[in-house]
């Protein structure tokens, strides 16, 4: 039986999802680390990792801030926290603290931290307002909040277009909304950050177009396979519809002229005033 905090995860917390999140982190890691370096995260910083998951970004942040810095990872899945703690133990990281908490139910309080990192979390929570307020309150004046959140999930698209994969993307978005999330939440973040006493410093769109020969093609591949099964469980796809999605993806994967555009997200950097 899943732990109470794991049962309602939209994408699940099983081993396959842990592995998929690792692949996802590797695909986007160059973009992420470039962002962290650009905003100045370095030795001695105290960083908050929101929705730390299995700890992929947490461990990278801990290595960047070094032994004189620290990382606080917040995650509500006991399963993910188990994996994250083991990851940090294997990498010899002693500057990481994890807390099992649901940010929709608790307040972090005034922690005086230097920066926060939030990737693909705001799109799943029931109250982005509360999430942003929690983050703002945890930062020191001048502290930075960094977000990678979807703004145009509709750009999830294969070329040539394939009808079952188009419907799959629509059902993914609908499943998030059915649990209180919003796939295009980044559109609202600048206003929410302003209302929480933060100043937006920069916004950058992040989107890629990849072919089957590209490493990043594995990202939609793993996402589709796992989420077809998840959408079947939720009753959003029949077995026949799920099989057609997988058939269309196999056809795209075998076609060297196929292309995939990733769902666009925004890289938002804001500063607490």
What are the language-model segments listed below?
Residues 114-129:
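A short SAM/SAH-binding and catalytic strip from SAM-dependent methyltransferases
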Residues 26-45, 60:
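Conserved alpha-helix/loop element of class I SAM-dependent methyltransferases that forms part
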Residues 146-214:
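Conserved catalytic/acceptor-binding region of the Class I
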Residues 183-184, 201-273:
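Conserved Class I S-adenosyl-L-methionine
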């Amino acid at each position: 039986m899943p732990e109470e905090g794991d049962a309602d995860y939209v994408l699940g917390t099983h081993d396959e999802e842990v592995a998929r999140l690792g692949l996802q982190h590797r695909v986007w890691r160059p973009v992420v680390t470039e962002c962290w370096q650009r905003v100045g995260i370095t030795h001695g910083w105290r960083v908050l990792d929101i929705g730390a998951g299995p700890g992929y970004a947490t461990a990278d942040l801990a290595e960047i801030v070094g032994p004189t810095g620290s990382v606080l990872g917040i995650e509500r899945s006991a399963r993910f926290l188990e994996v994250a703690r083991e990851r940090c133990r294997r990498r010899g990281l002693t500057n990481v603290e994890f807390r099992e908490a649901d940010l929709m139910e608790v307040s972090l309080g005034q922690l005086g931290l230097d920066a926060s990192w939030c990737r693909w979390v705001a799109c799943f929570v029931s109250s982005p307002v509360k999430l942003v307020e929690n983050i703002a309150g945890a930062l020191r004046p001048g502290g930075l909040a960094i977000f990678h959140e979807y703004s145009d999930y509709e750009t999830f698209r294969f070329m040539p277009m394939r009808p079952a994969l188009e419907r799959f993307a629509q059902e993914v978005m609908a499943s998030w909304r059915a649990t209180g999330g919003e796939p295009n939440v980044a559109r609202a973040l600048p206003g929410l950050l302003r209302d929480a006493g933060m100043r937006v410093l920069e916004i950058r769109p992040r989107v890629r177009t990849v072919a089957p020969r590209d490493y990043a093609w594995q990202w939609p591949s793993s996402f589709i396979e796992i989420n077809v099964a998840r959408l079947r469980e939720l009753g959003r796809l029949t077995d026949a519809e799920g099989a057609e999605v997988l058939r269309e993806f196999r056809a795209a994967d075998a076609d060297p002229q196929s292309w995939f555009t990733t769902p666009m997200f925004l890289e938002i950097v804001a500063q607490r005033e």
